[in-house]
Structures are given as C-alpha cells and as structure tokens.
Regions:
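Intrinsically disordered, low-complexity non-transmembrane regions of multi-pass membrane transporters
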Residues: 1-5, 11, 18-20, 182-226, ...
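Structural signature of hydrophobic alpha-helical transmembrane segments
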Residues: 2-16, 62-75, 125-132, 247-259, ...
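Hydrophobic transmembrane alpha-helices of secondary-active transporters
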Residues: 17, 44-52, 64-92, 258-267, ...
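C-terminal ends of transmembrane helices
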Residues: 20-32, 78-90, 180, 263-277, ...
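Flexible hinge motifs at transmembrane-helix junctions and intramembrane kinks/re-entrant loops
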Residues: 24-40, 57, 61-64, 183, ...
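Entry/N-cap segments of selected transmembrane alpha helices
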Residues: 84-114, 226, 282, 297-327
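Juxtamembrane and boundary regions of transmembrane helices in multi-pass small-molecule transporters
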Residues: 115-122, 166-206, 320, 325-338, ...
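Alpha-helical membrane segments and immediately flanking helix-loop junctions
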Residues: 116-161, 168, 180, 197-199, ...
C-alpha cells in the first residue's frame, strides 16, 4: 500500500525532519563531534522508520517530488544571486586548482568503478553508473544517463541502479565530510570558536557560511528578493527547453545558477542596485535544508538492500577513495590550512552526493570553527557549474572508449 503526500503534507514532513535533526544534533554529542548536518541526521531517522514500516507492513510513502526539485532550484538560484563578479575575482588561482583537483578525481572515480566492475564480472557501464554518473553527477545525471544506457546498450535496470547509487552517495557524502574536515582541523590544533552577536553582525553579508546566524530582513526586501528568484527560475525554464532542443542539455539548476549570476551583476553594475544579500542568504539556506530533508524522505532503503553484492562493494570502495582523496589530495593541493580542510569537506559532499550536501558539510564545520570565505566562494561555483561540464566530457570519453 502506498500513501501519497501532496505538497502541503510533504512540506510538513520535511519541517518535522529538520526539527528532529536539530533536536538530535543538540542532544547527541557524537553527531556534533562528527559535524553531521541536521537534515542528514533527521532524514536518516525518517528513512529508517519508513524502511521498517515497508518491511513489516508493506507500507510505502510517496512524497511530492516537484517540491523537492523546486527547493533545489531555489538554492542554486541563491548561489547565482550571491555571485558578485568583484568577489569571484578573488577566487583566482585557488579556483583553478580546485577545479583541476575535482576533474582529476572524476577520472579516478571512473577508473575505480570500471576497474572493480570488470574485476567482479560486471558490465563496465555499471562501473560508470557507480562512478561519476551517480556519485559526482547525482540524481539528475543518473536520470539522464540511465535511460540512455538501457535504450542504446541494453543495460536493464540502469536507471533504478543509478537512482539507488546516487542516493547512497547523497547519504554518505553528508556523513563523511564533517569527520574528514574535523580530523584535519584537529591535527592543525585549531579550536572551536564562540560566535558572538558582534561577530554575527560583522559578518552579516557573508552568504551561506553560517546558516544559524540571525539576519534582519524586511518585508520589502523579501518581496524584491522573491521577484529576482522568480525571474531566475523563469529564465531557467525558458533556457532549459531551448537547451534540450539546440544546445548541450545541461541540468536546469545550471541555468538557475547562470541566471542568478547574470541578473545579480547586471543589476549591480549597470543599474547600481544595492542587493540585499541577507534575504538571499535566508531563502537559500532554508531551501537547502528543505531540499535535503525531502531528498532523504524519498530515500527508499529497500531499494539499496536490493543492490547486488558486487555493486555494494564498489560503492563502499568509492566512499573510501573519496575520503583518501579529500585528505591526501584536495587538502594538500589547496594549501594544508583551515580553508583547505573546509574545501575537503565540501569536496566529499559533491564528490559523492550533491552541491547542497557540500554546502551543508561546510556549514557544519564553519559553525563550529569559524568562517571560510574561500571555501564558500569556490565550492558552490565548481560544484554547481564546472563539475557538470567536466563530468559530461569525461563520461562521454569513457562511454565512447568502452562502447564506441
């Protein structure tokens, strides 16, 4: 029996997940020590409860997926609207280095997936599905490549396997990022910081770095900000249809990001509009939390248990590889400092899961140890935009090599 939740009940369920997550993180020291994001903590509890209900009583729940997608698009729009070109210039060489590090990891991820799949007697394409298609690419990329593999190469169940693998990555990307960064930070001897009210006021315009900071916004600024969000979403809808017909078939969230960047910089440069970053920050962080909560509510653990043993082995090895790469490559190449540790947490997030997971990982660290402007400048831009272009190019090369 399946119970369907409409958008209202889905929103209620997501907020309950967030409240449970907040309570758990507040009460359980282990979750705080490992910097587990509140949506991940609450979402996993919800997923386990839904799994038990399914196994014992055959009950499943269907939550409103378009609402989850909408919050994801709003989150990426907020990243674009926060991307002032004058700030992006500050990315400089670290932005280039991090992009190269991420690109190299995509290649490593696919070699690990294909190598293990071949060794275990599976189709190499399954290695790509348990590689960067689902782990770096996420659910959107899995949904795009899965039907293609089924239609062109007869790989039965590719889409379902892709969805399950992407879900695995989303969960573990949120679980490993905090512990990896915390271990690196502890080694350098950095201590947790006290976030005083004065600190919060001084840093009020730093977007996404501390989701729990109090921000003062007005009804007027909220309406103006909502108008910009609506314009970006409309732009993304138009470009998504045009893109599928004539261009590269990029995910819609890329167009949300791009639209936000364009609108932000045209308004500030050409019309001298004073952007109200605090309102953008509030909408972006709220959307991020709700997206993650809904994604985990839609997690069907019984589908993960249905994964073949070899596929589970591949995904487990990929998780270990991500931890090692973030620790010994990402952290080292980005400078072996606090910013590098936060970047490593972010890389774990979108290297296995998605950019929202990366941001949640970094927020859990900066809330404890203080801000990292560099990480919050670089990770959203690379994770939301550059990584999809690089991943598409690398995947095309791998597929052509094995099936060309």
């Amino acid at each position: 029996m399946e119970w369907e939740f409409n958008s209202y009940y889905t929103l209620i369920a997501a907020t309950l997940v967030l409240l449970v997550g907040k309570f758990l993180v507040k009460k359980i020291k282990l979750l705080r020590d490992f910097n587990i994001p509140e949506p991940v903590a609450g979402g996993l509890i919800a997923a386990i409860i839904l799994f038990v209900l399914h196994q014992l009583y055959g009950v499943s729940f269907k939550f409103e997926k378009p609402l989850q997608d909408a919050f994801m698009l709003i989150f990426f729009t907020s990243i674009g609207l926060s991307a002032d070109f004058s700030r992006l210039k500050a990315g400089g060489l670290p932005l280039v280095i991090f992009t190269a590090v991420v690109g190299a990891f995509i290649i490593v991820q696919n070699f690990v997936g294909v190598g293990l799949a071949t060794a275990l007697g599976l189709d190499p394409l399954i290695g790509l599905i348990t590689g960067s298609i689902t782990l770096t690419g996420g659910h959107g990329t899995a949904g795009a490549w899965g039907p293609d593999f089924e239609a062109k190469y007869g790989l039965v169940g590719a889409t379902g396997l892709g969805m399950a693998s992407a879900t695995f990555g989303l969960v573990f990307g949120g679980l490993i990022g905090g512990p990896v960064a915390r271990r690196l930070i502890n080694k350098m001897g950095r201590k947790p910081v006290e976030n005083t009210k004065q600190d919060q006021d001084d840093n009020a315009d730093d977007v996404f770095e501390q989701a729990k900071r109090t921000r003062l916004i007005t009804a007027e600024s909220a309406v103006e900000t909502l108008a910009m969000f609506a314009a970006c979403l409309a732009f993304a809808e138009i470009m998504d249809g045009f893109d599928k017909e004539y261009l590269f078939d990029l995910p819609k969230f890329v167009w949300c990001l791009f639209g936000g960047v364009v609108i932000r910089n045209i308004l500030t440069a050409a019309f001298k509009v004073n952007m109200f970053d605090r309102a953008i920050d509030v909408f972006g962080n709220a959307s991020l939390s709700l997206f993650l909560a809904m994604a985990l509510l839609n997690l069907k653990l019984w589908e993960l248990t249905g994964l073949a043993g070899p596929v589970t082995v591949i995904l487990a090895v990929q998780t270990v590889v991500m931890v090692l790469y973030a620790t010994f490559v990402t952290y080292v190449f980005m400078g072996r400092d606090y910013d590098a540790a936060v970047l490593a947490a972010g890389h774990c997030g979108f290297g296995l899961g998605a950019t929202p997971t990366a941001v949640a990982n970094m927020q859990s660290i900066t809330h404890t140890f203080g801000p990292s402007h560099k990480a919050f400048l670089i990770v959203p831009m690379v994770g939301a935009f550059f990584v999809d272009l690089i991943n598409a190019a690398i995947l095309t090369g791998f597929v052509n090599f094995f099936k060309g």
